[in-house]
Amino acid sequence: MTANNEKPELIPIDSGFSVLYKGKYLYSKRSPQKNILQVISSIVIQSETLVLCVSPVLGYGLKELLEKLPTDSFALGLEADEELLKLSKNKIDKNILEDSKFLYTGTDSINILLKQFDDFIKGKKIRRVIRIDFSGGAALNQSFYSQAFDFISQYISQIWINRLTLIQFGRNYARNFFKNYYSILRSILKSPDKSSALNINSCFGSLIEKSVNRPIIVIGAGPSLDSSIEFIKENRDRLFVLAVDAAFAGLYPEIRPDAVVLLESQYWIQKAFIGITDLDIPIIADLTSNPSLLVKLNGNKSFFFTDYSAQDSVASSFFSVLKEKNILPLRLEAMGSVGLAALALAERLAFDGLPIFHTGLDFSWGQGFSHSKLSYQVKNIFSDISKIKSLYTGESLFPNKLSFEKGKNGSLAFTSPNLKNYGELYKKLFASKENFFDIGQSGLELNSKKINFDTAKKIIDDFYSCGGVVDLNYEA
């Protein structure tokens, strides 16, 4: 949080107070309340709206805003400057600070803000967010406030995307969950070791947190994987290779993953494993993943659980009971992307500070393809070519709602709304992680810690030469 030796000074004037801080008046010297009251009087607030109140300082306008809010709308006060926060909490009416429709938070951390915001909106329906700057204090941390607004907007959007996904796929998720859970219970009953019945959780596999002590590379199936293959081959023996389901077939046999992450709930994912179901490679599977495929795979299986029910209070309470009774495996936030799930798993598996590389997480199209040329999706396209069926159909060449967005290294990336949303989730969850390194040379701009292959190799070399302790402040 922004702090300094300078203190904000209250300046008495005829109609109240202004604040002098860092050489600037944060309110008008003539009528400090006039501007904000005019804004609140003129603004239209729809139902199910969150109002982001930036730098409220003396609280002018908050009372009028809360009176104007629809019954199903709320206000979030945000202050990033420590000195202004102290002044603000002393000057704002306690009735406002204690109002159930208002949350006042002081932080300059997006992660802390989103955590407090998530707690605040539990059980509430928020469809949109609007921003109101309550004082000149908004200009002191303009970049952070803009970022906060963008992240909150994206957060709300993700909530509704999850709800729509649940409407479309919820029945399938639930069916798969109970089929897989029942299969685990049956394995307990058939086990000669009856003591396992006393600990159902042990049958979810050996997914032990902080159990990997080698640098991890998460391999997605995006186009950037193609340029990373040689690097992975050269350093294979020094890496823990965690591959997503769609990339597995293209890697094997030259690169045998240490584990494969399976997330997909629909039957089509079985195509990605044709001819490779009996390789005895460990599988880390979501309990909602396709049960028919899980039965065919003969590798050791560990399970995790994607919290797809977070927006459904009844289902969420059911899973909470399972968790309390310790009969639910590792629980992850619903992200919708197997690549993001693999990153979350890698973070759980790794010792603190262990380097985690990733490639193939482009969240965009490459030259003609949405996936790596090694992926089963691209191989499937080529296998379907015939005299009367070309490589590209209209929909595959020009998918619906594609757009150009900012790509890595100043380039443009061709992406879709869903892929762009995954990219925004990456920014929220992983972009700020010091030990995460992006070696993918193409794709959507993720604000990730991008490095080239030489730098990645140096990090690995340093890890082994320094006994597992490395300086994470590398530049490409």
Residue spans for each PLM region:
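Active-site gating loop/helix substructures
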Residues: 300-327, 383-411
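Short, composition-biased local secondary-structure segments
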Residues: 215-225, 310-317
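Catalytic or ion-translocation cores adjacent to nucleophile or general acid/base/metal-coordination motifs
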Residues: 239, 243-245, 253-297, 305-310, ...
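Long, contiguous hydrophobic alpha-helical segments, chiefly transmembrane helices and signal peptides
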Residues: 61, 65, 75-77, 244-245, ...
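Active-site/ligand-binding-proximal alpha/beta "capping" segment
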Residues: 292-357, 361-363
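Acidic, contiguous segments within the catalytic cores of piggyBac-derived transposases
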Residues: 348, 368-384, 403-412, 416-417
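N-terminal donor/sugar-recognition subdomains of glycan-related enzymes
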Residues: 1-216, 223-240, 252-257, 267-280, ...
